[in-house]
Amino acid sequence: MSATLVIMAAGLASRYGGAKQIEKVGPGGEILMEYTIHDAQRAGFDRFVIILQPQMLEDFRAVCGERLEGKAHVDYAFQSFDALPDWFTVPEGRTKPYGTVPAVLSGKDVITGKFAVVNADDYYGPGAFTLMYEALEKLPETGRGCMVAYNCLLYTSPSPRDTERS
């Protein structure tokens, strides 16, 4: 089965203070997205669509584009207000991109077949991509979706108030 991983990387990262999508985190200057693509390929994903803002492409390619493009089938799509449905009105003065659905809509011309969506600045680990791929394999060709979620209640830690009482 062919499966595409859509990687949303068009966020402004304004709280972070820079383009965290291309922040080097690995010993060889790898960015988090390279680990995502590696893990996803091992699970069976064979195509990657990276959603960026147009002005991000040059910096992205300078940091890791050649490495990624040499290891995987990579297409780029650009998140812009132009990809939004005609009936949607963007408030005057808004420059910040909208979230998940508008990002995926930006890639509608290059996303084909079964696909999964992830954030560029999160680490999912190999197991998540195996679950995603296996779930996609079980779906009919059209009309159905799935989601990989985690039970966060399994990973609770004491709150600051609990430690103050100790």
Residue map of PLM features:
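Conserved donor-nucleotide/metal-binding helix-loop-beta segment in metal-dependent transferases, i.e.
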Residues: A128-L154
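Conserved N-terminal catalytic core of the sugar/cofactor nucleotidyltransferase
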Residues: A3-T4, P27-V117, Y124-L131, K138
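Feature marks short, surface-exposed loop/turn motifs that line or immediately flank catalytic pockets
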Residues: L12-A13, A83-L84, L154
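Residue-level signal for beta-strand positions within conserved beta-sheet cores that form or flank
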Residues: M1, G18, G70-A72, G143
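Conserved beta-strand scaffold positions in the cores of enzyme catalytic domains, especially
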Residues: I22, Y76, G145-M147
